[in-house]
């Protein structure tokens, strides 16, 4: 599979919105990135706060049919984790399904969306947006009301804002998505499961999760199955969780 393009934008409202608008211009795997995103989505309805020049905002477009498209966020979390370890030597943990934590604080957020394109919107693709906190100061997270967020620089990494965004964008596109995509497109999440489980901070901890019919369940997270679902042992048996909010005891202030 060849990479069509990694496109840099000096400024962008939202890299996800840009890729949706230009989806047909990309090959099987292509990407866009910026360090100045002015109209992103704040978590849980919060107002978006831009960190101009101090964070990487990246979206990859995938036109390849996928065996398990719903598990792309899990693959994406591994892709980012690997690139951050290569660049900075940090060992991030994954909060299921796709938040990356460093020293217990969130350093990466991921949002995947389906896309329709082409004649009468009959084409189907998927995009994956990734935000990496590179060098925001503590005051940024205070202003954005993100008490559980942090940046690589705040955690002691040596960040070079003149070169790192391009290095990470190229590395994510080539090594994070393009190279494993043949296996992932054919076989889904299963070949990546062991690596994911080893990095998943949920496993062995008490979690609270949303139930499909409403309400919440609680128990100990014991595994991530081959379909990417979080396996939770509850008082009434095992639950396989795939959607909804999951809180982890001791993470983000959850008790």
Annotated model-derived regions:
Residues 1-90, 106-108, 115-116, 254-255:
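N-terminal lobe of the biotin/lipoate ligase/transferase fold
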Residues 65-67, 74-92, 102-255:
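Long, positively charged amphipathic alpha-helical accessory segments at protein N-termini or as interdomain linkers
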Residues 41-46, 95, 197, 206:
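Basic side chains
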